[in-house]
Amino acid sequence: MAKEAVKYVWEGAIPLQIHLHKSDVASHPAPPPALVLAPRIGYLPLLIPLIKPYFKDSLPPGEDSIWFDYKGFPLKWYIPTGVLFDLLCAEPERPWNLTIHFRGYPCNILIPCEGEDSVKWNFVNSLKEAQYIINGNCKNVMNMSQSDQEDLWTSVMNGDLDAYTRLSPKLKMGTVEDEFSRKTSLSSPQSQQVVPETEVAGQVKTARIPVRLYVRSLNKDFENLEDVPEIDTWDDISYLNRPVEFLKEEGKCFTLRDAIKSLLPEFMGDRAQTSGEERSIDDTEEADGSREMGEIKLVRIQGIEMKLEIPFSWVVNNLMNPEFYLHISVLVKAPQR
C-alpha cells in the first residue's frame, strides 16, 4: 500500500484548462483554451514551455511577465500546483479553469518569478530548510555535488520517481518510525531506499517533521463543499511554516490529529468540535463551548480528504513532497466571538 501511495503522489496530475486573458489577446478570434495535465508536485511556471507556444500567435509584441490567476485571484507560483488546487477548490473542479497573463505582473501580491531558475531556487531552499528542521543542519544538501543536485531537480521536474529514489538517500533525511510504522513498514520507497552500509549508521530517525500548513477560515458554516465561497484575497489564508514534534509514547500511535492539534490547538482542544464524537443534544453548555472553539471541516493532503485517526508516520513517509515538506490544507469554521 505504501508503494502505491508514493506512486500516487508522484503520478498525480490535475487537468487544467488554461485561458489566455483577454487583455493579452492580439488576434481574432481569441484562441481556444489550452488543455494541460499539471503534476501535483510540480509548479505552474514549469508549464510555461508547454503553454506559451500554444498562444504565441495570439500574443502582442513585447516582454513577457507571465503569471496565472483563478477567477481573478493571482496564484502564488512557489506553492505546489496540487496544494493550490486543494486549497482553492473546496469542491474539486475538473478541468481546473485558470487564466494565464503575459503582462501586468501583480508585484504587490506575487514575488517575482524568473521561470525555472526561480522555481529551482525555491525547491533547493526548501530542501535546505527541511534538512535543518530534521537534522539540525543542511550540510548534506550543501555537500551534494552539482551534478547530483541537478539530477535531483530534473527528477522532480520530470516526475521520475526511480531517479529521485536513487538520489534522495544521499541527503540522509531519515524516516519517521513509531510502533505502527515498524509493524507495517517497509514498503515505502522513502523507507526502503537503498543506502550503502556506511551511510545507514548516519541515518536519523527524525522526531521533527517539516510541515507547511495552509488554513482557510470561514465565518459561516456550510453543509456541502459546493457552498464554500470563493477566496477574495490571500489574507483569507493563514500560512504556517512550522515543524511538528513527533512524540513517541510507548503503546500509543501518534496520529494526524495529534500533529494538527500541535499546530492548531485553538481548534483541537478537549471541547473543540471534530467529527466522530458523540454529543448530548441537551448539553447546551457543551455545544456552546464547541462553537466557541470552532471546527475543522476538512483536511486535505495530496488531494486526499484525510481521517484524523491515521498514523502520522504513514502520512509523512508516503505523502510528503519531494522537498521533504508535508503540505496540509485545512478548511475551518472560525470560532464565534
Swiss-Prot record:
<keyword id="KW-0813">Transport</keyword>
<dbReference type="GO" id="GO:0010150">
    <property type="term" value="P:leaf senescence"/>
</dbReference>
<comment type="subunit">
    <text>Conjugated to ATG12.</text>
</comment>
<dbReference type="GO" id="GO:0050832">
    <property type="term" value="P:defense response to fungus"/>
</dbReference>
<dbReference type="GO" id="GO:0005737">
    <property type="term" value="C:cytoplasm"/>
</dbReference>
<keyword id="KW-0963">Cytoplasm</keyword>
<comment type="similarity">
    <text>Belongs to the ATG5 family.</text>
</comment>
<keyword id="KW-0346">Stress response</keyword>
<dbReference type="GO" id="GO:0006914">
    <property type="term" value="P:autophagy"/>
</dbReference>
<dbReference type="GO" id="GO:0042594">
    <property type="term" value="P:response to starvation"/>
</dbReference>
<dbReference type="Pfam" id="PF20638">
    <property type="entry name" value="ATG5_UblA"/>
</dbReference>
<comment type="function">
    <text>Required for autophagy. Conjugation to ATG12 is essential for plant nutrient recycling. Involved in a negative feedback loop that modulates NPR1-dependent salicylic acid (SA) signaling and limits senescence and immunity-related programmed cell death (PCD) in plants. Involved in complete proteolysis of chloroplast stroma proteins in senescent leaves. Involved in the degradation of damaged peroxisomes.</text>
</comment>
<keyword id="KW-0611">Plant defense</keyword>
<protein>
    <recommendedName>
        <fullName>Autophagy protein 5</fullName>
    </recommendedName>
</protein>
<keyword id="KW-0653">Protein transport</keyword>
<dbReference type="InterPro" id="IPR007239">
    <property type="entry name" value="Atg5"/>
</dbReference>
<dbReference type="InterPro" id="IPR048939">
    <property type="entry name" value="ATG5_UblA"/>
</dbReference>
<dbReference type="InterPro" id="IPR048318">
    <property type="entry name" value="ATG5_UblB"/>
</dbReference>
<keyword id="KW-0072">Autophagy</keyword>
<keyword id="KW-0832">Ubl conjugation</keyword>
<dbReference type="Pfam" id="PF20637">
    <property type="entry name" value="ATG5_HBR"/>
</dbReference>
<dbReference type="InterPro" id="IPR042527">
    <property type="entry name" value="Atg5_UblA_dom_sf"/>
</dbReference>
<dbReference type="Pfam" id="PF04106">
    <property type="entry name" value="ATG5_UblB"/>
</dbReference>
<feature type="cross-link" description="Glycyl lysine isopeptide (Lys-Gly) (interchain with G-Cter in ATG12)">
    <location>
        <position position="128"/>
    </location>
</feature>
<dbReference type="InterPro" id="IPR042526">
    <property type="entry name" value="Atg5_HR"/>
</dbReference>
<dbReference type="InterPro" id="IPR048940">
    <property type="entry name" value="ATG5_HBR"/>
</dbReference>
<feature type="region of interest" description="Disordered">
    <location>
        <begin position="271"/>
        <end position="290"/>
    </location>
</feature>
<feature type="compositionally biased region" description="Basic and acidic residues">
    <location>
        <begin position="276"/>
        <end position="290"/>
    </location>
</feature>
<dbReference type="GO" id="GO:0015031">
    <property type="term" value="P:protein transport"/>
</dbReference>
<keyword id="KW-1017">Isopeptide bond</keyword>
